[in-house]
């Protein structure tokens, strides 16, 4: 069974576009593991481990206009798909993730 006409309802954006959305007030959710989060994360992000989100997605209170981030953009794309399935609008996957953030020389926060 082909599903080619199934539309993906989240945007896959790189660092410059993500930074603009953050300035516009988008929520940033980091879905990496605790040890990764503790090494440093995008300033202002909140932390929900991907498996926790997938186990009970509706409990996480994801709002419209959310950017999901992980190390590179793979796990965050899974979270983005789940958010869209929950009916969240204007979902963005940060393609490049915290690696791109650090590579650009941008600051990170630690808990």
What does each model-found stretch correspond to?
Residues 69:
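Short, surface-exposed ligand- or partner-binding patches at beta-edge/loop junctions that are enriched
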């Amino acid at each position: 069974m082909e599903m080619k006409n199934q539309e993906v309802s989240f945007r896959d954006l790189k660092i410059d576009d993500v930074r603009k959305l953050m300035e516009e007030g988008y929520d940033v959710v980091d879905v990496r593991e605790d040890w990764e989060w503790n090494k440093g994360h995008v300033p202002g992000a909140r932390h929900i481990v991907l498996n926790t989100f997938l186990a009970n997605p509706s409990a996480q209170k994801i709002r419209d206009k959310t950017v999901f981030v992980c190390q590179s953009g793979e796990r965050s794309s899974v979270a983005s798909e789940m958010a869209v399935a929950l009916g969240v609008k204007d979902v963005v996957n940060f393609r490049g993730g915290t690696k791109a953030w650090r590579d650009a020389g941008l600051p990170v926060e630690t808990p």
